[in-house]
């Protein structure tokens, strides 16, 4: 039997794309294996959000070269954002690569693989599709009994933040028809899903460009009506598009988890303007204030970039002050990495490397203390936990997540998977809590 090995890098959008890829190659008679050495077909689904992620892809491809030399019939494919960005250059850089499949072309992957099998043909397909075709083009995903699943509601991004490659590799915003979203949610619940995360580069702008479509807040309310669904999450949200209507959903919908990821990126107006974020510091803090007023128990995470071109010590201190005010439970922090094709790549990199690292370390230390305070505060609380499966610690425990998206490991029987159970948090670790079932 033919076999394939798939490795996924990057965001939740790529996770969904990979599930579609699995469905497509299984339709050709391929079965999944755990290592590239066993595979007849190797697929990398890639991320190019930062230079490091791109380098990682080429590093992996280098390790596959000896496999291709030993087995010339082996098919190697690269999908996703690096494929979209590099296109034909990938085939030139990696002469043993067979397929380069862009973000709009996953539906064509089965045909490309079949052609590579029969004719040893090499393929590059990275053309963007028209919006109407993209809107209805979602290949069937491989079935899964996982408790928590992602559902794509919008693709692409229209914001063109100056540092971000996403609009260049994912294209402009296109909302998926709400009827299709609801149909997929129902199907996944029938397969065993109890939690659905609605995803997109900017879910808040769902439906804004389609005259016949509902708002994202209205979509949330319809998803909440699906029988058998216990929890809803969504990501990612752009602060400038976070409406009062959407914020009110946190108070109105019991199924909506009390957590939001709201990337701020910087704390000073000058840097935010240079980033083309479309909001000010005060406007961002105003959204946070309203979220907490409407839903006092909500917790927030965020993204922050340090060392953006032109950033001053004073502007960095404004970011530190914003972290103190916002009190995120966690941040995903990065030192600025210029991406080719973005407008920020043309700006002078005028901040010394050691200064960037110093700022980054200070910011990380501050946030780690805030995070530690949250985790210690939670010890002793009894919280509803959706049980997702066996703990990744490999110690026979189960794991699940709180409404705040915090991982909890605890002792319990496997028949609890898929249920929401009360768990008392007993010990706090950096990335999880230990608990005991009540």
UniProtKB/Swiss-Prot annotation:
Enzyme Commission number, as recorded: 2.8.4.3
Record's keyword terms, sorted: 4Fe-4S, Cytoplasm, Iron, Iron-sulfur, Metal-binding, S-adenosyl-L-methionine, Transferase, tRNA processing
Span of domain TRAM: 376-438
Cofactor dependency: [4Fe-4S] cluster
Binding site for [4Fe-4S] cluster 1: 11, 47, 81
InterPro entries on file: Elp3/MiaA/NifB-like_rSAM (IPR006638), Methylthiotransferase (IPR005839), Methylthiotransferase_CS (IPR020612), Methylthiotransferase_N (IPR013848), Methylthiotransferase_N_sf (IPR038135), MiaB_methiolase (IPR006463), rSAM (IPR007197), rSAM_horseshoe (IPR023404)
SMART domains, A to Z: Elp3
Domain MTTase N-terminal intervals: 2-118
GO MF annotation terms: 4 iron, 4 sulfur cluster binding; metal ion binding; N6-isopentenyladenosine methylthiotransferase activity
Cofactor note: Binds 2 [4Fe-4S] clusters. One cluster is coordinated with 3 cysteines and an exchangeable S-adenosyl-L-methionine.
Residues holding [4Fe-4S] cluster 2: 157, 161, 164
Cellular component terms per the entry's GO annotation: cytosol
Every Radical SAM core domain range: 143-373
Location(s) in or outside the cell: Cytoplasm
Reactions catalysed: N(6)-dimethylallyladenosine(37) in tRNA + (sulfur carrier)-SH + AH2 + 2 S-adenosyl-L-methionine = 2-methylsulfanyl-N(6)-dimethylallyladenosine(37) in tRNA + (sulfur carrier)-H + 5'-deoxyadenosine + L-methionine + A + S-adenosyl-L-homocysteine + 2 H(+)
Family classification: Belongs to the methylthiotransferase family. MiaB subfamily.
Subunit structure, interactors included: Monomer.
UniProt function note: Catalyzes the methylthiolation of N6-(dimethylallyl)adenosine (i(6)A), leading to the formation of 2-methylthio-N6-(dimethylallyl)adenosine (ms(2)i(6)A) at position 37 in tRNAs that read codons beginning with uridine.
Name recorded for this polypeptide: tRNA-2-methylthio-N(6)-dimethylallyladenosine synthase
Naturally occurring in which organism (per UniProt): Syntrophotalea carbinolica (strain DSM 2380 / NBRC 103641 / GraBd1) (Pelobacter carbinolicus)
């Amino acid at each position: 039997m033919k076999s394939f090995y798939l490795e996924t890098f990057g965001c939740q959008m790529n996770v969904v794309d990979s599930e579609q890829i699995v469905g497509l190659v299984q339709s050709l008679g391929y079965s999944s294996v755990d290592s590239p050495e066993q595979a007849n077909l190797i697929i990398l689904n890639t991320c190019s959000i930062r230079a490091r992620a791109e380098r990682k892809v080429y590093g992996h491809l280098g390790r596959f070269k000896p496999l291709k030399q030993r087995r010339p019939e082996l098919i190697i494919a690269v999908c996703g954002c690096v494929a979209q960005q590099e296109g034909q250059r990938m085939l030139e850089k990696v002469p043993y690569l067979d397929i380069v499949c862009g973000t709009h072309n996953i539906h064509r992957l089965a045909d490309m693989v079949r052609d590579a099998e029969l004719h040893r043909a090499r393929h590059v397909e990275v053309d963007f599709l028209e919006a109407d075709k993209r809107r209805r083009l979602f290949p069937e995903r491989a079935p899964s009994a996982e408790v928590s699943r992602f559902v794509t509601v919008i693709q692409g991004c229209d914001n063109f933040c100056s540092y971000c490659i996403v609009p260049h590799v994912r294209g402009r915003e296109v909302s998926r028809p709400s009827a299709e979203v609801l149909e997929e949610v129902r199907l996944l619940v029938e397969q065993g899903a109890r939690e659905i995360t609605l995803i997109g580069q900017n879910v808040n702008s769902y439906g804004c460009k389609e005259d016949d479509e509902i708002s994202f807040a209205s979509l949330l309310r319809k998803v909440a009506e699906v029988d058998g669904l216990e929890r809803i999450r969504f990501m990612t949200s752009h602060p400038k598009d976070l409406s009062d209507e959407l914020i009110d959903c946190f108070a109105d919908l019991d199924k909506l988890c009390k957590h939001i990821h709201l990337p701020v990126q910087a704390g000073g107006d000058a840097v935010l303007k240079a980033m083309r974020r479309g909001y000010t510091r005060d406007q961002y803090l105003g959204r946070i204030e309203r979220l907490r007023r409407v839903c006092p128990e909500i917790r927030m995470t965020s993204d922050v970039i340090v060392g953006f071109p032109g950033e001053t010590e004073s502007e960095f201190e404004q970011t530190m002050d914003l972290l103190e005010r916002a009190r995120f439970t966690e941040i995903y922090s990065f030192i600025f990495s210029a991406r080719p094709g973005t407008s920020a790549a043309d700006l002078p990199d005028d901040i010394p490397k050691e200064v960037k690292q110093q700022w980054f370390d200070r910011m990380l230390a501050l946030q780690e203390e805030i995070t530690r305070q949250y985790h210690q505060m939670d010890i002793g609380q009894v919280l509803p936990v959706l049980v997702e499966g066996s703990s990744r610690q490999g110690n026979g425990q189960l794991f699940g997540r709180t409404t705040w998206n915090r991982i909890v490991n605890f002792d319990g029987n496997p028949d609890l998977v898929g249920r929401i159970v009360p768990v008392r948090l007993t010990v706090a670790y950096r990335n999880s809590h230990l608990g005991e079932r009540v």
